[in-house]
Amino acid sequence: MVETSHALPLVDVVLLFAYKRTGKTRVSMAFKDYSRAKKGGAADTLYFNAFTEDLFTWDNDLEGDSDRYLSLNTNSRFFNGLKDLVLDEAIARYLHRYADFEFDIDYVDWKITFHKRKAGARNIKISRGEQSLFVWCLFLAICERMLDGHESYQWAKFLYLDDPISSLDDNNAIAVACDLVQLVRRAPSRKDQDGADAPVKVVLSSHHALFFNVVCNEVGRGKDGPKLAHKRYFLQRPDENGKFDLQPTEETPFFHHVALLAELHRAAEPTGRLFTFHFNALRSIMEK
């Protein structure tokens, strides 16, 4: 974690690849604690991780089965200035790229209702995958305002994205990756309200190999915007002392299948442990 923090002043973006159950969320929380300790306890990082989606909870109207909505936990700083930011249009612009449902945000009761674009059904319960997409689109809209230098997010000096997509098909994974990089390109040139330089440093971690590869390729391209200075790492499982190992990958092609084989080898050892994702990894390798 300290290595990642030390790398950030030298680059615009740090990219971490790690398998499921490696501890990516723990690493993001360690980053938060380390950063806050350096700032005397003041928050300076805008996060997207497992805790972000927990800020949204369903009321399924079990009695009437008709008034279903998603509640927002407005105690979180994540929603600072949400009402004044007028995000509906920006959220819809992203959401229409990935899904076919509409939404309405009630800023009085802080709840969100959904309906189908074509069928017209109201107050529908969307799937978990659709909910993840909506939360992600809301987050992108907030990031836009943050990078615009809006006063509600002037406190954010870092942007930490932990597994922004967990279960998307390949087409959406590619689209989300490209949209994200287009937004991140603005981070180094952010200005504050007085016009002074206020760059944002970005950390992205993911277990999704295709998504990670697309992001790596896009941040290194200068065709559609400025090339971003970045470092790439493979985050390995913590050892018996709980210490994580970061393997740099800038000098060689991204070694997804080699790393999978190494992980399977460790799991097969007498001291290793097998989890569901190991079987999925084996199937992935056998299908290649």
Regions found by a protein language model. Give the residues of each.
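ABC ATPase nucleotide-binding domain signature region
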Residues: 28-82
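N-terminal nucleotide-handling cores and adjacent loading/scaffold lobes of large enzymes
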Residues: 1-11, 36-50, 105
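Short, solvent-exposed segments of well-ordered alpha helices
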Residues: 167, 171, 196-199, 248-251, ...
